[in-house]
Regions:
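A short helix-coil junction within the Rossmann-fold of NAD(P)-dependent oxidoreductases
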Residues: 1, 28-37
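Substrate-binding pocket helix/loop in short-chain dehydrogenase/reductase
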Residues: 1-3, 7-12
């Protein structure tokens, strides 16, 4: 829907799912992750966090806010062993994707399990990257900071 036409309850639901639930999860799991000498946290984002795609307002805004939340958490853990990163899985064969792109051939997209396989290496003790965005399709981390 156009941004001005989104119902308040729909907007609130998107914010609750993508931001508040992650914040609550952070509050719950952080003590456990900090007890580990190799705590790792990955938070799923979306490419729409970086684009102003028409009719995606609440979702895009929530994913952009989510990425900032994750970067703040990573900065707060800078002096700990905990590594925190966001993940942009790229187009993935999900029910949400099918609803958003009904004419798209799902066979052209990876299944969630295939995406998850690529994330395993981000959870290993030897990972030393934190506060970045991992783009699954490009198989690389990108930095958020713009060149000065």
């Amino acid at each position: 829907s156009p941004l001005a036409h989104v119902e308040a309850k729909v907007f609130d639901q998107v914010i609750d799912i993508n931001i508040k639930s992650t914040w609550r999860l952070i509050r719950s799991v952080e003590p456990l992750l900090l007890k580990s000498d190799a705590g790792r946290a990955l938070v799923l984002s979306s490419s729409v966090a970086h684009t102003a795609r028409a009719f995606w307002g609440p979702y895009a805004a929530s994913k952009a806010a989510l990425e900032v939340l994750v970067r703040v958490w990573a900065e707060e853990q800078e002096k700990t062993a905990l590594k925190v990163n966001s993940v942009d899985p790229g187009g993935t064969r999900t029910a949400m994707r099918a609803r958003a792109f009904p004419g798209e051939d799902p066979a052209t997209l990876p299944k969630p399990a295939e995406v998850a396989e690529k994330l395993i290496k981000l959870c290993t003790p030897d990972l030393d990257v934190t506060g970045k965005l991992f783009k699954v399709r490009e198989d690389r981390f990108v930095d958020y900071r713009l060149p000065e």
